[in-house]
Amino acid sequence: MPISTKSTRRQCLQIGLALLAAPAIGAQAAVAVEVWKDPLCGCCEDWVVLLRQAGFSVKVNDQGNDAARKRLGIPEALGSCHTASVQGYALEGHVPATDIRRLLREKPQAVGLAVPGMPVGSPGMDGAVYQGRKDPYKVLLVAKDGSSTVFHAYP
């Protein structure tokens, strides 16, 4: 049975289009995160690097984070050295990328997540200078009324 030229061209075109579309299947656009930090803070910069390595697109503002923390609704008592915003949620401190992704997946009614202080061993506070030390810390889910609950505890 002879193969028609029209049929062969059509099949080649369909295969070519499928191959062009293949990289887009399953590909996700990078989630945008905006960060406010002090320009001289090394641990904040380390956290930004870790977010980028985890696939986030990060914009950095080096004017400090006090105003951003207040504007985004994070209580001062839960403060840390940097504040960020992602898809309508606030992030305070050294929040792990896995917890950010969980927050975005679960979409709780909340202000966002906070890791108060600067716990050693948290992302960005885990460099060689700390010699492998890991202190326990908690990622808190911050409610709109300012209260918080444990979102994830790290031993």
Residue ranges and their predicted role:
Residues 1-7, 11, 15-25:
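N-terminal secretory signal peptides
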Residues 77-155:
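Thiol/selenol-based redox catalytic cores and closely related redox-interacting motifs
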Residues 31-46:
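Local sequence-structure signature of Cys/Sec-based thiol-disulfide redox active-site neighborhoods
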Residues 32-33, 57, 87-90:
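Short active-site oxyanion
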Residues 58-68, 78, 86:
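Thiol-based oxidoreductase modules, predominantly thioredoxin-like and allied folds used
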Residues 5-7, 70-77:
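Short low-complexity, flexible loop/linker segments enriched in glycine and/or proline
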Residues 40, 47, 64, 96-100:
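Stable alpha-helical elements in mature extracytoplasmic
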